[in-house]
């Protein structure tokens, strides 16, 4: 059950930059790390492989590809420039030509399916967006890859909006030239059997055929590469809204096949500073949760990495980082492409990014005739969600104009950062400031608009799970904010990002 986290998107460092302000809006992210607690030793059991590394089972060759010669694979590594160029300043509105990154007006035709293949999905994405597929993989015996992490990033650079869509590895789809299979087998089939464009090509076509989303660029990283990315950035501060406990190898150097080397590990709610190994565990583990919950945590790490890249001045380090990480990340984006995208950083914030997850009710658990447990798409529900994810959001524009200030009125470290992150998921830009006291028993929402827009006020209360009695009218023409939220000891940090889709 290996799955590299989505954070390898540093390969798209221009996209990382284009998602500027991620983490905590205009404010500096809290620096207090959440406690990491070792709970208990692993139970006695018969020796088994690590719960994250089941024995590899060689897949049978797809019958429709028996007569295709397996090619010698060439690496998809980008070519680094001999002497990295400096990042151009972004002091004015970007005038750089992004046309080379956008798709052509006419989308390429979908591959034809067999007579028993389902009808292809209607293409949902237009030429106004640039669509990236972020792939997390580990290399299997024999040199093949299994892509258990797939996140689609849809970027509208001119409109300063983006969407992220997590795809579960067990999604049951039609793979062109192969047939009905789990989506995480598409890349391997494309690599092994000479599909046009290799693994990335077949995965692109599979996503277009089943989800109706055109993929323009891809980036893939393995586990070791992910650790290196995080450590290169000096670690990452991840807002952990809900405590998370799962089995973890006590030390990365220990034998994962010895069950005594595992113990339950807990990350408490708070802003947790993670190195590469801890971030990898947090984003890929699922023994005590599910693939859907893992997708949520992967997007948490991805968002945090975006913000970390900016807070560590990575904009000016893009050429050097590109050179340093070129052997870690396989991508079709060149340094010039990334620098072009980096110019759009000032116009985007974390609140500009909407998070989507292909999970129930968009899929249902199903067992194939061969006995495989998969996730079957619920076509009507899934299509509606994908239409929303691939369309610019007017609600996001409205909410982004609302100024919300967050204060921590308690002695609980990082509470304001968690609330700000929660509002960012819902599309609200936030700013952090110091409270006048740390003994607020109950949270307070000060409405400086004097109820001019009750829908926005009620939305804030709903998102933060606060009662209407928390609202206080406080007209102040010089406030600089529309709403001030002072968090009290009654504030509950845990929330579900999928409930905040807007």
Model-derived regions, located:
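Bacterial N-terminal signal peptides that target proteins for export
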Residues: 1-6
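Bacterial N-terminal signal peptides
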Residues: 9-17
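Non-catalytic, solvent-exposed segments at the cell envelope interface
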Residues: 20-502
